[in-house]
């Protein structure tokens, strides 16, 4: 398995590669959100049903505008999300019509986060777009907390391990429905 720095992954991801990378709290699995083949590979590796949907992480909100239908959110709803970003808050927002079902699952919305983690931000900046994000584990198992765990669990199944350090969080992000304001998962 390749071991790369964030600045070295652009071509691999844009050509359909699936990567493992450190996030705020655990290692994540990621790929290009515009490549259905890569998303299907990620879902197969994780053994996750497509119907559940996935998260997009970004370095700034402008990377998410091709996926999120802002016209369905009020200025106040958007401002609330912006007040929490970058940070450990994931917002469920309405999708634009062209967004892949493999990303949003059986929903008319998608979970999005503007990350405060330097490594995640560097990945998204290198790509020039958001990154699909899901915890690096098989469905129902604990997420990986080290590069060694990634190598043991995913050798031969993913294309690269991105080098870097986990963030300081020990809990997953809080998930909030942007339309209703309802907290769907309490996190950090």
From Swiss-Prot:
InterPro entries: DHBP_synth_RibB-like_a/b_dom (IPR017945), Sua5-like_dom (IPR006070), TC-AMP_synthase (IPR023535), TC-AMP_synthase_SUA5 (IPR050156). GO terms for cellular component: cytoplasm. The keyword Cell membrane does not apply. It catalyses: L-threonine + hydrogencarbonate + ATP = L-threonylcarbamoyladenylate + diphosphate + H2O. Residues 3-188 form the YrdC-like domain. The keyword ATP-binding applies. Its EC number is 2.7.7.87. It holds the Pfam family Sua5_yciO_yrdC. It is found in: Cytoplasm. GO terms for biological process: regulation of translational fidelity; tRNA threonylcarbamoyladenosine modification. It is an enzyme of class 2 (transferase). Keywords: ATP-binding, Cytoplasm, Nucleotide-binding, Nucleotidyltransferase, Transferase, tRNA processing. It comes from the Bacteria. One of its GO terms (molecular function) is L-threonylcarbamoyladenylate synthase. Required for the formation of a threonylcarbamoyl group on adenosine at position 37 (t(6)A37) in tRNAs that read codons beginning with adenine. Catalyzes the conversion of L-threonine, HCO(3)(-)/CO(2) and ATP to give threonylcarbamoyl-AMP (TC-AMP) as the acyladenylate intermediate, with the release of diphosphate. HAMAP family: TsaC (MF_01852). Belongs to the SUA5 family. TsaC subfamily. This is Threonylcarbamoyl-AMP synthase.
């Amino acid at each position: 398995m390749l071991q790369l720095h964030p600045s070295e992954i652009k071509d691999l991801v844009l050509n359909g590669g699936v990567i493992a990378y450190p996030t705020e709290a655990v290692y994540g699995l990621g790929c290009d959100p515009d490549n259905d083949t890569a998303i299907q590979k990620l879902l197969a590796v994780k053994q996750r049903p497509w119907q559940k949907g996935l998260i997009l992480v970004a370095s700034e909100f402008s990377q998410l505008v091709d996926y999120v239908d802002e016209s369905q959110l009020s200025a106040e709803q958007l401002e609330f999300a912006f007040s929490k970003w970058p940070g450990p808050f994931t917002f469920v927002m309405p999708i634009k019509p062209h967004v892949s079902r493999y990303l949003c699952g059986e929903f008319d919305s998608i979970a999005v986060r503007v990350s405060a983690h330097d490594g995640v931000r560097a990945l998204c900046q290198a790509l020039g777009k958001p990154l699909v994000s899901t915890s690096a584990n098989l469905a129902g198992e604990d997420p990986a907390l080290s590069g060694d765990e990634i190598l043991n669990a995913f050798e031969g199944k993913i294309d690269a391990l991105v080098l870097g350090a986990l963030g300081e969080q020990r809990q997953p992000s809080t998930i909030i429905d942007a339309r209703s304001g309802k907290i769907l998962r309490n996190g950090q």
